[in-house]
Amino acid sequence: MGSSKSKPKDPSQRRRSLEPPDSTHHGGFPASQTPNKTAAPDTHRTPSRSFGTVATEPKLFGGFNTSDTVTSPQRAGALAGGVTTFVALYDYESRTETDLSFKKGERLQIVNNTEGDWWLAHSLTTGQTGYIPSNYVAPSDSIQAEEWYFGKITRRESERLLLNPENPRGTFLVRESETTKGAYCLSVSDFDNAKGLNVKHYKIRKLDSGGFYITSRTQFSSLQQLVAYYSKHADGLCHRLTNVCPTSKPQTQGLAKDAWEIPRESLRLEVKLGQGCFGEVWMGTWNGTTRVAIKTLKPGTMSPEAFLQEAQVMKKLRHEKLVQLYAVVSEEPIYIVTEYMSKGSLLDFLKGEMGKYLRLPQLVDMAAQIASGMAYVERMNYVHRDLRAANILVGENLVCKVADFGLARLIEDNEYTARQGAKFPIKWTAPEAALYGRFTIKSDVWSFGILLTELTTKGRVPYPGMVNREVLDQVERGYRMPCPPECPESLHDLMCQCWRKDPEERPTFEYLQAFLEDYFTSTEPQYQPGENL
């Protein structure tokens, strides 16, 4: 999808320039995570980075083929000068006999080339050689190697990280500016009695001579010098810089080098997390080393050949708000292996103990995260087909990710394919999709409007008191769900935009993301918490 700009007033046309596709994932279910990065199951809180690596095409498990890997776009520039020495940004524990364990701060020499998601490297500390995840390292002495540099994360994502109540005043990060190419932004947590915990953003401008400044009277030859100075003196900032913003370790891109079609024996199913019409979801371990989620499909649910073909597409979808597809067992019963999300499905989360404590700001933020993931799906010209709270997964710190995209198209069960059958999610489905099978990104937008009602009612089934057939008839006649109790009318208006009869008149996900991210500054600045919202 392009990024043509037009006035935000027309939501169906609004386009905003967002970061290019980088890390993305599929699948379905449980791990902690954070903005620009996915979180590993372990709980290390270390600064996140933003190095997107483009999907490679791993071969059958155990095979080696580097001919079809793709150079990481964000690293390519840094490596053009022949950089081969890198520094580890995080600890990494090897998962196979061919990869390399290392500790944060270790220096590593790249042996072959810096392409794809897994690089062959030699540790200058331990003297050992093996494959390393490329998003766990950065060129030595580069800005990317700094703990406080978070790269290409959005203003909203930086606020999500910095607004953690555990962060002291002055917690900070440096990121790329969203609005000025080549400039940076210093984001700092602050506190005052009027606003409470809040974040201030300072544009870091670049001098023609190569230096940097926030205010022209105080200039620095490097970002490192700028950070060191403001760590000692506030000098006009809201507070001096105190702590680097903590976040979780990112997910690796895939389980290991060439671990795509994996043997069933390499997986151990440990805790059953859920069960649906077409299979079960388990927490498990791959190769005795790595926490994963495993979706098992009942034999006959879909053709293994069709699934494998679709999975090749799904694994290339990488975004921090999509659950990452790690690997597959492609013979029946099909297993789908994904990152593990610790809090389970959004539907269960809303209906559970935590749901009672969620208020509109948290719910709107969760909706904005889902819209962000779907805006990426939109840009990639893909369609989800089954967007609802049951297919959104929740991690630590209310991180939400879209799961199970694309799978609905492959289901061969008659109770589903009839579209009016008992297993078909009719209450979430746009009328043109339910009646005529026209599934598009615009039918996903309709489903997102229904998902907004799930959020604002803490998991209530849509169209309460109505059966599927009745829903289809009533919606065709123009019926739309009323505004949920305590929900602002402005949010209900957004739902109704998603439910416009003409699919082309519905908003884009890009517009929905922008609207929801700015909701409490642009639309509802006077919001006051109520009993439930």
UniProtKB/Swiss-Prot annotation:
**What CDD domains does this protein's entry cite?**
PTKc_Src, SH2_Src_Src, SH3_Src
Task: Please state which protein family the record places this protein in.
Answer: Belongs to the protein kinase superfamily. Tyr protein kinase family. SRC subfamily.
Q: What class of enzyme is it?
A: transferase
Q: Which GO terms describe its biological process?
A: cell adhesion; cell differentiation; epidermal growth factor receptor signaling pathway; immune system process; negative regulation of extrinsic apoptotic signaling pathway; negative regulation of intrinsic apoptotic signaling pathway; progesterone receptor signaling pathway; regulation of cell cycle
Reaction equations catalysed: L-tyrosyl-[protein] + ATP = O-phospho-L-tyrosyl-[protein] + ADP + H(+)
- Lipidation sites of kind N-myristoyl glycine? G2
Q: Which residues carry this modification: Phosphothreonine?
A: T34, T46
Query: EC number(s) on record?
Result: 2.7.10.2
Q: How does it sit in the membrane?
A: Lipid-anchor; Peripheral membrane protein
Give the modified residues of type Phosphotyrosine. Y416, Y436, Y527
Positions of modified residues (S-nitrosocysteine): C498
Q: Region entry Disordered: which residue ranges? A: 1-58
Q: Using the record's annotation, list all stretches that form the Protein kinase domain.
A: 267-520
The organism is Gallus gallus (Chicken)
Q: Which domain of life is it from?
A: Eukaryota
Binding residues for ATP: L273, G274, Q275, G276, C277, F278, G279, E280, V281, K295
Which residue range or ranges hold the SH2 domain? 148-245
**Control of this protein's activity:** Becomes activated when its major tyrosine phosphorylation site is not phosphorylated. It can also be activated by point mutations as well as by truncations at the C-terminal end or by other mutations. Heme regulates its activity by enhancing the phosphorylation on Tyr-527.
Instruction: Give the location in the cell.
Output: Cell membrane; Mitochondrion inner membrane; Endosome membrane; Nucleus
Q: Does the keyword Lipid biosynthesis apply?
A: no
In the UniProt record, does the keyword Aminoacyl-tRNA synthetase occur? Answer: no
Q: Which intervals hold domain SH3?
A: 81-142
List of catalytic residues: D386 (proton acceptor)
Q: What is this protein called?
A: Proto-oncogene tyrosine-protein kinase Src
Functionally, this protein is described as follows: Non-receptor protein tyrosine kinase which is activated following engagement of many different classes of cellular receptors including immune response receptors, integrins and other adhesion receptors, receptor protein tyrosine kinases, G protein-coupled receptors as well as cytokine receptors. Participates in signaling pathways that control a diverse spectrum of biological activities including gene transcription, immune response, cell adhesion, cell cycle progression, apoptosis, migration, and transformation.
